[in-house]
A protein has these predicted regions:
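Active-site-proximal structural scaffolding
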Residues: 106, 203, 221-224, 266, ...
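Short acidic alpha-helical/loop segments enriched in Asp/Glu that coordinate divalent cations
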Residues: 241, 281-292, 318-331
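A short alpha-helix capping/helix-coil boundary motif
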Residues: 247-251, 331-334, 343-346
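Structured, contiguous alpha/beta core segments that scaffold functional sites
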Residues: 1-262, 266-268, 272-275, 279, ...
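Long, compositionally biased
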Residues: 299-330, 334, 384-407
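Hydrophobic alpha-helix feature that most strongly marks membrane-spanning transmembrane helices
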Residues: 278, 313-317, 321-329, 359, ...
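Small/polar glycine-rich anion-binding or flexible loop at a beta-alpha turn
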Residues: 291, 333-341, 371-375
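Non-transmembrane, aqueous-exposed alpha-helical and coiled segments at domain scale
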Residues: 339-347, 351, 357-359
């Protein structure tokens, strides 16, 4: 290679990901270009994605084998179990893999992983960036996936070779991108943040005005400015009193209606973004308004699990069964997340309900144990008599008139 070849060799000034973001970025009414990277710079969006993907990544996930109609147990020894619970691929832990896949699912509406097979067994799951995958449905209704490699070549994979997590979809083929649907909200949040930064950079926030009854010479005005800056400027001097001399008066400048509206817009954007992701506002630091999910943090947390996380959990469980388990095992093996850890804060209310259900014969002990993912015990299929009918079960109804009371 000649010495001058370094000058002739083209150099990449931007990365491929940056070019992809530029092409995919959407112009908004606010003027902001919303891309995956710019969306993650919005604090509310970052927190929502982090909360949901973090929950999916940390919740216990296991394969459960159905022993019989009642008994369930971990599918110990099943090859896929190690992939899901120990090591999905050579460089990721299970929580890292699920967290990344869920983040892609939230932003792009789809998450993909290539299955590495040895015989009939999945031995690794290789995550694929959604922007490199084109999902198509054939005339036979089977899916196929065209994946663009880092060298620019495209490889086509059959449905049986890909794990596909699909968000809410209108065509049943690909999930809808949250990033595309909330680009106006994200654009407004980005522009509001930028406007605030420029406001502080240009120093347009005035604390007040000092009025002098006379006329100050340029030198006197300069000395007054320097004196005020030395004594009152900076965070360490915040709150210090100003000593007005020679008849001077201090008039504070109140927050203008425009500034107040700017602050209100920032608050509104947090609620709007939280609504897109289904995250309770208090979980992203927006506590100014109440919620209809309950008056307490505990009730709001349960609502988050019930109305948001359960949707994604079901997507994971059913996609694992469809794409990773052989059809011959569909009746015997299930993928299950354990959300009990997120609901432990309501243990008092949950067990109080169980006690009432047991007392009134609604549940048997084994049915309660099943709700808690516990195996049945001997003698646990008994239904207890309600308290006010104890000893009456099995007796013929009496024809005697009911007793009456007299005043």
């Amino acid at each position: 290679m000649g010495i001058f070849s370094r000058f002739r060799r083209p150099r990449a000034l931007v990365s491929e990901d940056q070019i992809r973001d530029f092409i995919r970025g959407s112009n908004t009414t606010s003027g902001a270009i919303v891309t995956e990277s710019s969306a993650m710079r919005v604090a509310a969006a970052w927190r929502c994605i982090n909360i949901i993907s973090g929950a999916i990544g940390t919740l216990p996930l296991d394969l459960i084998r159905r022993v019989d109609e009642k008994v369930r147990e971990p599918a110990v020894g099943y090859p896929l179990r190690r992939i899901l619970t120990v090591k999905p691929n050579p460089w990721q832990t299970p929580s890292e893999f699920r967290r990344m896949m869920q983040a892609n699912l939230l932003l792009r509406g789809n998450a993909y992983a290539r299955k590495v097979m040895v015989g009939r067994n999945v031995v690794a799951l290789i995550p694929l960036h959604p922007d490199r995958v084109q999902a198509e449905q054939l005339d036979s209704f089977a899916m196929q996936y065209k994946v663009r490699g880092s060298n620019g070549t495209t490889t086509t994979f059959a449905q049986k070779e890909i794990l596909h997590l699909r968000g809410m979809s209108l065509d049943g083929v690909t999930g809808m991108s949250v990033l595309s649907n909330m680009r106006e909200s994200l654009g407004l949040a980005l522009q509001t943040e930028k406007a605030g930064a420029r406001l502080f950079k240009n120093g347009m926030l005035t604390g007040g005005v000092i009025e002098h009854p006379g006329k100050l010479s340029p030198e006197a005005a300069k000395n007054l400015h320097e004196s005020l800056d030395a004594r009152n400027a900076g965070a360490d001097n915040a709150g210090k009193w100003i000593l007005a001399e020679e008849g001077m008066t201090f008039r504070p400048v109140a927050l203008s209606a425009e500034d107040a509206q700017w602050l209100g817009t920032r608050d509104y954007q947090r609620y709007d973004i939280a609504m897109f992701f289904g995250v309770p506002p208090h979980m992203i630091g927006a506590t100014e308004k109440t919620t209809s999910w309950g008056s307490g943090i505990e009730a709001q947390g349960i609502g988050f699990v019930t109305y948001t996380l359960n949707d994604w959990i079901k997507t994971w469980e059913e996609s694992i069964k469809r794409d990773l388990l052989p059809e011959s095992d569909w009746e015997a093996i299930d993928a299950r997340f354990n959300v009990n850890g997120l609901l432990r804060g309501d243990v008092k209310g949950r067990w109080g309900g169980y006690v009432q259900a047991l007392q009134w014969g609604v549940y048997s002990p084994n049915e309660v144990r099943a709700l808690e993912d516990q195996n049945p015990r001997d003698g646990g299929d008994v239904y207890y008599d309600p308290p006010n009918t104890a000893g009456q079960i099995g007796k013929e109804p009496s024809n005697e008139p009911a007793p009456t009371t007299t005043n």
